[in-house]
Swiss-Prot record:
One of its GO terms (biological process) is defense response to fungus. It comes from Arabidopsis thaliana (Mouse-ear cress). GO terms for cellular component: extracellular region. The keyword Signal applies. Keywords: Antimicrobial, Disulfide bond, Fungicide, Plant defense, Secreted, Signal. The gene is SCRL28. This is Putative defensin-like protein 227. Residues 1-26 form the signal peptide. It comes from the Eukaryota.
Length: 97
């Protein structure tokens, strides 16, 4: 009987503790000042895909003035669709605007 009472009291206390805990809401902070560029280029990513994407994006946007190419961050994805036997890669790059 003593153990049953102790169990019931601990359950009630646990219930009160769990009710007093506030839910933590995840806050989505929008990344202000971040621009995203996507491009499709010939070839596969390989081991240095990020570097190849940065170079390809710099060549592609060579003529645009004021472009901050120093902070360019890229990801490389191999395109699963091969057209006419030529592999392609997709580069998604982000830059501070």
């Amino acid at each position: 009987m003593k153990w049953a009472t102790l169990f019931m009291v601990s359950c009630v206390l646990m219930f009160f503790v769990m009710n007093n805990i506030n839910e933590v809401e995840s806050i989505h902070v929008e990344q202000a000042g971040v621009c995203e560029f996507t491009g499709e280029f010939p070839g596969k990513c390989g081991n240095n895909g990020r570097k190849m994407c940065v170079e390809a994006m710099n060549k592609k946007n060579k003529g645009s003035p004021g472009e901050n190419k120093k902070n360019l961050r890229c990801e490389c994805f191999d395109n699963p669709v091969v057209i006419l036997g030529r592999p392609k890669r997709i580069c998604r790059c982000r830059n501070n605007c």
